[in-house]
Structures are given as structure tokens and as C-alpha cells.
């Protein structure tokens, strides 16, 4: 999608957010090569993982992360409980947080 956006002439910022599951330092280089300007790290990463990933961040690629908010019991974008139970897709920003129900 990033390459298609650039090929279509889009010149704005291209961000890969938490649902891209960029959990390995090498994934940042791939994101940069694909044309990303910013990567938003998954919430599930430990502080040590964030340090390791940020140390490998290529020049010109911005890193961002959330430090507050709901923490999913699954890796971001990998859970289908909400969609299966309620038809609401977490991948479309509409998670019902069904995993938190009693």
C-alpha cells in the first residue's frame, strides 16, 4: 500500500501503525524501504524491546508509541474475538473488547 500511494503521486506522510505488528528491529528498515515516514510501535512491547528497536531505527524514520490506553490481550491486529462475537472488527477501529467481558 505504501508503494502504491507513492506511485499514485501521494506526497504526504505515510505511517505504519500498531496493526502492522512491527516487533523486530529489522522490520523498521523494511518499513523505511517501503516508504514509511513513521512507525507506531505495538503496545505489547516491553521497555527492553522498545530500546532495542529504537536503537536500530534508520535515519529519517520517526518512531511513536502509545503509553496509555487499553492493552489488548492479544497482539494488536491478531485477535478476531470481537468480530466473531459482535461483528465489530478491531482492525477497523471498532473493537468491542469482548475479551474483557465476565
State what each model feature region is:
Residues 1-22, 40-102:
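Active-site pocket-lining/capping segments in soluble small-molecule metabolic enzymes
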Residues 24-26:
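Conserved nucleotide-cofactor-binding alpha/beta core module
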Amino acid at each position: 500500500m505504501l508503494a502504491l500511494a507513492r506511485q499514485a503521486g501521494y506526497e504526504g506522510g505515510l505511517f505504519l501503525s500498531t496493526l502492522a505488528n512491527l516487533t523486530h528491529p529489522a522490520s523498521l528498515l523494511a518499513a523505511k524501504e517501503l516508504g514509511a515516514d513513521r512507525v507506531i510501535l505495538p503496545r505489547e512491547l516491553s521497555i527492553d524491546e522498545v530500546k532495542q528497536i529504537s536503537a536500530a531505527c534508520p535515519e529519517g524514520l520517526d518512531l511513536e508509541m502509545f503509553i496509555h490506553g487499553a492493552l489488548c490481550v492479544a497482539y494488536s491486529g491478531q485477535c478476531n474475538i470481537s468480530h466473531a462475537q459482535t461483528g465489530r472488527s478491531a482492525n477497523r477501529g471498532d473493537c468491542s473488547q469482548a475479551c474483557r467481558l465476565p
